[in-house]
Amino acid sequence: VQSFLEFEKPIAELENKIADLRGLSTTENDVNIDDEIATLTAKVETTLTQVYSDLSAWQKTQVARHAGRPHFSDYVSRLITDFTPLAGDRGFSDDQAIMGGLGRFRGQSVVIIGHEKGKDTNSRLHHNFGMARPEGYRKAVRLMDLADRYGLPVISLVDTSGAYPGVGAEERGQAEAIARSTAKCLDLKVPMISAIVGEGGSGGAIAIAAANRVIMLEHSVYAVISPEGCASILWHTADKAPEAAKQLKLTAQDLLSLSVIDKIISEPIGGAHRDPGTTIDSLGNAINDYLTDLSDIPGDELRQAREDKFLAMGAL
């Protein structure tokens, strides 16, 4: 069942009319409803194009959080063959908010890491809604160590509202784990490509996104804090989240203009949740192009270029 966001009400009404028409018996009174369905379907496409061509930062945040967007497991199943997952941090436990392993991407051996939010109530609880604990970032470091050791490119997929802020996570060194994972990204001597595929929230995102190339899906977001968190700090109310989203410059379009990211991947009309397969294939093509470009660059140069890239951000 398609779920609709608040600003998609005109689209929802049209979709509901189409569903009602399809539910009618076409034999009753010899009424042919195909033409009416075709007209409404065309109107849905037109309305989708109009609505999605002018989304606000807050609306893009809502799209980025849509439960129907492709998840890490979807990308792996469509893009990676011979996937072998790696579990645990060899210190405390196996965090399920960050998944990863080794596999083949279009014939090339790679290490892939990413946040997994889960798709239903049980899986979301299992994956802690994509909010990683320290063990998740330490698992990511293990995977990056393997990539460095065996000369394998790293692909990371970011989709998290932020690292888990619980007491236990803090007691086990959340800040240190995030810092160490970020440092490992910057120290790699193999190509690293990161993609923001949904939410990119704060240190929980950058910990696996300090890459040679950072790309974003068209309606994903990437910021130092959530709009609700920012609004609560600045205005002492989460009701100001739409204004905070605008001021945070968190959209892919804003971040490309600021040179924080390298490329925007177009989503199907109506967002990635309307056509996950096409979205995944488009992202795969972009990743493949960047891996090809970076494959012949020596490791020391990759490392230095990555460091220079991030040191240059914010420079006047």
Question: Residue spans of the language-model regions?
Answer:
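Short active-site-adjacent helix-start/loop capping segments
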Residues: P70-F72, D120-N122, Y164-G166
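Gly/Ser/Thr-rich beta-alpha loop segments that engage phosphate groups in nucleotides
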Residues: S109, E116, A132, Y164, ...
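Short hinge/gating elements
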Residues: T61-A64, L125-F129, G270-H273
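Short, motif-level signal for alpha-helix interfacial/capping segments enriched in acidic residues
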Residues: I33-E36, G136-Y137, C230
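Intrinsically disordered, low-complexity segments enriched in small/flexible residues
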Residues: V1-S109, G277-L316
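Terminal peptide-recognition signature
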Residues: L14, S56, I112, D159, ...
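Glycine-rich beta-alpha loop segments
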Residues: D82, F92-D94, G100, F105-L157, ...
